[in-house]
Amino acid sequence: MSSAPKQTIAPHGGTLINQVATAEQRQKYQDGAGGFKRVRIDDRAVSDLELIAIGGFSPLTGFMGSEDYHSVVEKMRLTSGVVWSIPITLPVSAEVAETLEIGESLGLEDSTGTLVGILDLAEKYTYDKLREAEMVYRTTDEKHPGVKVVYGQGDVYLAGPIMLLERRPHPLFASRQLDPADSRQAFIDKGWRSVVGFQTRNPIHRAHEYIQKCALEIVDGLFLHPLVGATKSDDIPADVRMHCYEVLIEKYYPLDRVILAINPAAMRYAGPREAIFHALVRKNYGCTHFIVGRDHAGVGDYYGTYDAQYIFYEFEPQDLGITPLMFEHAFYCKRIAGMATTKTSPSGPEDRIHLSGTKVRAMLREGLEPPPEFTRPEVARILIEAIQKQGQ
């Protein structure tokens, strides 16, 4: 490899945002905490606050005002013209909003009552929940988990710049916690000029492993960035998934070409729009490429199998600034005795080993390992143990 790079890809919008309080600022705000009105925010808002502050959501410096919100919902762009596909907002009830005055600083507290951030209130506005659901999630069905959140949240959005008072270690995965500035430096230290990001909220099976390794053939490094924020109640817990990832990497991946780090974001399940969002966030972490597979960030049957890939063609490459690597569904092909997709397999469905998620979960509950062509035995054993513990 040629001489090590001195910098990574530019962050989205050109500047990596840092809204984390210095020790001096933190002391100032904590000393004056008694004078702040305080607003309790949910876990998703806490993770959004954190990601804004550390630059994961660059160029955002706070929760969106009404003009940016409407522009994102309708056009997938900020009013500046920068591509942004998911509204990042702070909902409160109308009753709470009435007690707040534009221009004041608000203390943001988490579910335990701990003061985690400051919002300089620039605006408060109402919004159309049905329109947000229709445009962002492509459905108004309240059974959709993302739509359910929108319908159930407060009727007023608060907007303004934020400050995160303290960057706290993750209670479970502190050793895997890399902020965008950290991951960018890690890529430079490794001499990686090109890095592919992979988003996941599920255990990695052979199909995922295959497309990651296909991507590794054309880039310098893999940034495995599993989501550990809020997900659906029936998703595999984050600690179990992380154990699967660590075991898999240790045994089956080139250790010098993979970095595993947590993504503190919450899932929206917004399918195509969230695929764009996930790519832009990984760009902020320093990735030059991003893997988009089948039904990325989807749920149920709300989106077409490859809608999350097609949406990338709605934007000019320079407006995204990160290259999507699009893969079809992978499977084990018995005829060639290896992993393939319909692009590379000469066989029909009869020679493909493919198991539905429902079938796999049923096997794991019964203590049965799926075939090694579908998942690595080490991963299967971790999942069996976890599922059986849940059932006790």
Curated annotation (Swiss-Prot):
Principal EC category: transferase
Reactions catalysed, as given in the entry: sulfate + ATP + H(+) = adenosine 5'-phosphosulfate + diphosphate
Enzyme Commission no: 2.7.7.4
The answer on whether this UniProt entry bears the keyword 4Fe-4S reads no
Q: Which domain of life does the protein's organism represent?
A: Bacteria
| InterPro entries in the cross-refs | ATP-Sase_PUA-like_dom, PUA-like_sf, Rossmann-like_a/b/a_fold, SO4_adenylyltransferase_pro, Sulfurylase_cat_dom, Sulphate_adenylyltransferase
Keywords (alphabetical) are: ATP-binding, Nucleotide-binding, Nucleotidyltransferase, Transferase
An annotated Gene Ontology molecular function: ATP binding
Annotated NCBIfam families: PRK04149.1 (NF003166), sopT (TIGR00339)
Know the name of this protein? Sulfate adenylyltransferase
Query: Origin organism of this chain?
Result: Gloeobacter violaceus (strain ATCC 29082 / PCC 7421)
Query: What lineage, starting at the top, does this entry show?
Result: Bacteria, Bacillati, Cyanobacteriota, Cyanophyceae, Gloeobacterales
